[in-house]
């Protein structure tokens, strides 16, 4: 019992010291009454012996989120809710933003890049969960520049070391075609333009697969080719009523934006269909063009695997085929059937046109290269040649003697006076 104290409640002298965490207490062992307790906080005199902890060594619990980061986090949540993404997507996008914001290359960036970072986090989350969403859609919602967005997106993926799978084209076709306002009759859409969603979607998928097989999709933005394929699928289902409708009118009816390269992708896809139509026997008698071939898209898609093999040849095997033909011509095979009697006669039997090589459009129609002309030389050939330079052209002793003899004769002729 310290100092002969007693419990004020029961009067017991059995008092023990009990340390409660960092606060010492004097407790009665009989009734449990706390008789005295120490001071939990320190006094000013005690704090004089303590050492202050710097911010760099602290736990960072008192650190506050900046206003810019708070605003961007709210924008991440708002963007996920506008796109109607699941809550798990929202949490993942927020975590990606917080990780990216700690990087020095992004934290010290300008304000426009931080605003674009919001869309990059949402796009990465959607790509990882195989959610069909394009970069252009987010740029439209954020009013962001596409070049700045793509650069920030690649930088973020590289710095964070993320594994982002490529976008599935079939899922993108389904989500993009679902936004078309052509599946229900309305005052802005006449009844002849309304189409069944499943039929239009299935035919659009087949056209996009055909474009992929013929190198029209590789290295290009997907939305223009999907827009062109959707337009052709919509026209081919009821060609009598829809052939007069242009691509711009179709996009206006569907309430979607017309991508700039969609018209070029449409012409390329029509050229492929026209090439395939020349391989079908019942279509060879018809003089088809890019307008009338739309009526037969159903037949072309039904036999597209066979038609692609017959209408196009593999570009990689083209060189081997040419070498084989050269060897056969060198051996003299088939020369009597195709060449006339005279040396300048035309072939008697006309050869069949070879199929178009199956190559990307950039290789079939390469851009013209600018040829730089060589600089014009100032040497005309009439300049005087010095004696030291002439010695460079003399190679044999006989040439040296001849030159000396000719030079002496020239000097002697100059010394002879002219006759009066």
From Swiss-Prot:
This is Transcription factor IIIB 50 kDa subunit. Zn(2+) binds at residues 7, 10, 28, 31. The gene is Brf2. The modification Phosphoserine is found at residue 354. Residues 316-387 are annotated as: Disordered. InterPro entries: BRF2-like_C, Cyclin-like_sf, TFIIB, Znf_TFIIB. GO terms for molecular function: RNA polymerase III type 3 promoter sequence-specific DNA binding; zinc ion binding. It is found in: Nucleus. Residues 322-336 have a biased composition (Low complexity).
């Amino acid at each position: 019992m310290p100092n002969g104290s007693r419990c004020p409640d029961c009067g017991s002298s059995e008092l023990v010291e009990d340390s409660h965490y960092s606060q010492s207490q004097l407790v009665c062992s009989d009734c449990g009454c706390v008789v005295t307790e120490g001071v939990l906080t320190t006094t000013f005199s005690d704090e004089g012996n303590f050492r202050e902890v710097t911010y760099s060594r602290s736990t960072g619990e008192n650190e506050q989120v900046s206003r810019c980061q708070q605003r961007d986090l709210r924008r991440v949540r708002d963007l996920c809710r506008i796109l109607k993404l699941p809550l798990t997507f929202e949490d993942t996008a927020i975590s990606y933003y917080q990780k990216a914001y700690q990087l020095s290359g992004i934290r010290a960036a300008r304000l426009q890049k931080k605003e674009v970072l919001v869309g990059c986090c949402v796009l990465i989350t959607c790509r990882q969960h195989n959610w069909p969403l394009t970069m252009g859609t987010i740029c439209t919602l954020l009013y962001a520049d596409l070049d700045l967005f793509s650069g920030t997106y690649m930088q973020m993926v590289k710095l964070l070391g993320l594994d982002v799978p490529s976008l599935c084209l079939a899922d993108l076709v389904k989500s993009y075609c679902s936004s078309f306002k052509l599946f229900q009759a309305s005052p802005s859409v006449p009844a002849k333009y309304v189409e069944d969603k499943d039929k239009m979607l299935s035919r659009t998928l087949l056209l996009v697969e055909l474009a992929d097989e013929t190198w029209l999709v590789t290295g290009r933005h997907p939305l223009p080719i999907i827009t062109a394929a959707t337009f052709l699928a919509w026209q081919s289902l009821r060609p009598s009523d829809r052939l007069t409708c242009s691509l711009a009118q179709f996009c206006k009816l569907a309430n979607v934006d017309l991508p700039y390269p969609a018209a070029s992708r449409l012409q390329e896809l029509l050229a492929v269909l026209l090439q395939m139509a020349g391989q079908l026997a019942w279509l060879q008698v018809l003089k088809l063009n890019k307008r009338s071939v739309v009526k037969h898209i159903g037949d072309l898609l039904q036999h597209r695997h066979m038609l692609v093999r017959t209408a196009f040849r593999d570009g990689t095997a083209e060189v081997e085929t040419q070498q084989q033909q050269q060897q056969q011509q060198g051996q003299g095979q088939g020369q009597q059937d195709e060449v006339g009697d005279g040396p300048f006669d035309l072939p008697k039997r006309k050869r069949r046109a070879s199929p178009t090589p199956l190559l990307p459009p950039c290789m079939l129609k390469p851009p013209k290269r600018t040829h730089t002309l060589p600089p014009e030389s100032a040497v005309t050939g009439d300049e005087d040649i010095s004696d030291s330079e002439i010695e460079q052209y003399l190679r044999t002793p006989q040439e040296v003697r001849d030159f000396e003899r000719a030079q002496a004769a020239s000097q002697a002729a100059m010394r002879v006076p002219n006759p009066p």
